[in-house]
């Protein structure tokens, strides 16, 4: 009988890049469905448009580099980047914004540094920051959740609003006729109210806040949390970064809330508002741009959580995950250098 001789580690199952990406995309679907349920068809349209642009850019770059187009498209990394950009921007943002952001993510952030596995920054978050800094008004104008809006746009209405086609007078009248077609998120509303001298309790008495979190956003975050837990169960990601992000945000927001409950939101609000669960399980866990050792991943995640709280409360933008992730990406080599695991048989570095 012939025995196959193989060196360690003796892995019993191989997880290819395409398999990992497929699992991440599938686990994103619950959050995407709930997000569409609360914020309309615009989110799905943005995701589909981003996928088309991302795959086209990926194929074009591979053609220019004389690489295999089929192999590059089949790893599903471009599709995942497109979906993350699509769910991050407002549902009714103009079509050219999602096109610009996706092209920037794939061509500049990903392939300018050598392609998959070589990019320094998370492509989706780099694209989001580009759009947020360049077009702050459009990037902070979210459609009102379906549970509080007097009317919500249909599929046709969403297409016309995104692509700015049809009867322009009618579309403008439609925009003005919907109460809250463009509105601030709960994070932005709280930040604005606190700057005007209102207390947290007074601000959260508004209808946009649903029992201390935010209409729609609690369920969206809960759906992404469920998908993230499945992702952990499938071992597509490790628990260190997600735990670090949530723990860092929870501890920082708890300290702030205990010191000044009138001007600081509760930890529950921070955990289930904005892009918290999406970022903790699907964005910060990008293995290319994160720290590599288990202890380093915990520090990396905790750094993101603390930075999110600082920027949310002291910065100029209501949600801060994109900035926090990019800043942590910068710190990842530093963390890896000083948090190296001890090699067996050698002293600690």
From Swiss-Prot:
Complex formation: The complex is composed of six subunits: RnfA, RnfB, RnfC, RnfD, RnfE and RnfG.
Modified residues (FMN phosphoryl threonine): 185
PANTHER family: ELECTRON TRANSPORT COMPLEX PROTEIN RNFD, ION-TRANSLOCATING OXIDOREDUCTASE COMPLEX SUBUNIT D
InterPro entries: NqrB/RnfD, RnfD_bac
Entry's Gene Ontology cellular component terms: plasma membrane
Name the record gives this protein: Ion-translocating oxidoreductase complex subunit D
Domain of life: Bacteria
GO biological process: electron transport chain; transmembrane transport
Entry EC no(s): 7.-.-.-
TM region positions: 36-56, 77-99, 124-144, 212-232, 239-259, 265-285, 291-311, 315-335
Cofactor(s) for this UniProt protein: FMN
The entry's keywords: Cell inner membrane, Cell membrane, Electron transport, Flavoprotein, FMN, Membrane, Phosphoprotein, Translocase, Transmembrane, Transmembrane helix, Transport
HAMAP family in the cross-refs: RsxD_RnfD
Similarity annotation: Belongs to the NqrB/RnfD family.
Enzyme's top EC category: translocase
Protein's cellular compartments: Cell inner membrane
């Amino acid at each position: 009988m012939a025995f196959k001789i193989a060196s360690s580690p003796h892995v019993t199952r191989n997880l290819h890049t395409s398999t990992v990406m497929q699992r991440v995309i599938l686990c994103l679907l619950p959050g995407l469905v709930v997000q569409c349920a609360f914020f309309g068809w615009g989110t799905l349209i943005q995701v589909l448009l981003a996928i088309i642009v991302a795959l086209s850019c990926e194929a074009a770059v591979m053609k220019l580099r004389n690489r295999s187009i089929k192999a590059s498209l089949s790893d599903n990394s471009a599709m995942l980047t497109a979906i993350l950009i699509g769910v991050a921007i407002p549902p009714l943002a103009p079509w050219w914004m999602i096109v610009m952001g996706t092209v920037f993510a794939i061509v500049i952030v990903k392939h300018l540094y050598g392609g998959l596995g070589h990019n320094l920054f998370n492509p989706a978050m780099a694209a989001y920051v580009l759009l947020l800094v360049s077009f702050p008004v459009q990037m902070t104008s979210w459609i009102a959740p379906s549970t509080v809006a007097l009317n919500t746009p249909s599929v046709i209405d969403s297409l016309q609003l995104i692509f700015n086609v049809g009867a322009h007078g009618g579309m403008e009248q439609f925009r003005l006729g919907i109460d809250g077609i463009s509105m601030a998120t709960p994070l932005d509303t709280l930040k604005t109210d606190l700057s005007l001298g209102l207390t947290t309790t007074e601000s959260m008495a508004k209808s946009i806040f649903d029992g201390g979190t935010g209409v729609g956003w609690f369920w969206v975050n809960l759906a992404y949390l469920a998908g993230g837990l499945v992702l952990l169960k499938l071992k597509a990601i490790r628990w260190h970064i997600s735990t670090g992000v949530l723990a860092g945000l929870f501890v920082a927001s708890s300290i702030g809330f205990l010191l000044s409950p009138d001007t600081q939101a509760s930890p529950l609000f921070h955990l289930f508002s904005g892009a918290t669960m999406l970022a903790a399980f699907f964005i910060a866990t990008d293995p290319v741009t994160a720290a590599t050792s288990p202890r380093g991943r915990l520090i990396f995640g905790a750094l993101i959580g603390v930075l999110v709280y600082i920027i949310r409360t002291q910065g100029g933008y209501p949600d801060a995950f994109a900035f926090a992730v990019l800043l942590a990406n910068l710190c990842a080599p530093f963390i890896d250098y000083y948090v190296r695991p001890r090699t067996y048989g050698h002293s600690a570095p």
